Amino acid sequence: MLGDKLINDCRIEVFGVTIEPLWVEAYCYDETHFPDYNTHRSRKQKNRFGQMYFHERGYGGVDICLSNSEDFCLSFLLKATLANGRFLTQTQLPRVLLSTGKTKADFEHLEDILHPANARHTICHTTRVNLTKPCYSDAPLTSFALDAIPKYDFRFARKNLRENVRAYLLAYMAAHPDCTEQECRAECRRVFGWVPDLVRTWVHN
């Protein structure tokens, strides 16, 4: 998936800021093949491969456009990143970028901002956060670095991560049939950084 490559194979270099994606969400609109109305359908999401797109809708944020055609929109929201080593959420990233003194237009005009990386994160997938429309709401269009989850503040994603935690926990219990609830909770905290309220139900059912 393109999201996996953005996280593991790319870093973003803009005006002295190095951005390492940790959680990215795909937004694509093709009238015939993928009519996702959660996508803004902005002209900045078309035919601007490798360029930034600042937006104000919803919570606001920054996307990377990966469309190379006027026929479809495709961009990835940078939902969580490291910027010069500092963890930032979707709403924090634009403020940090604009604190450089450059304008949104300055950033959006930049080309060749994607550079090779070799991050080697463990990549997982889930649904997108806080969608306003039902289309593709159950599709696993988010890619995220699993190993980053317990290290940083991913509270914004906990609702979407519940199914990932459940699947991981069921596999863990199958591999450790004698494990206790306490051990399962400790494993959840180790891998995901928190323990959902439903862990007790999952363990005892």
Predicted regions and their residues:
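Basic, alpha-helical nucleic-acid-binding regions used in initiation and control of genome expression
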Residues: 166-205
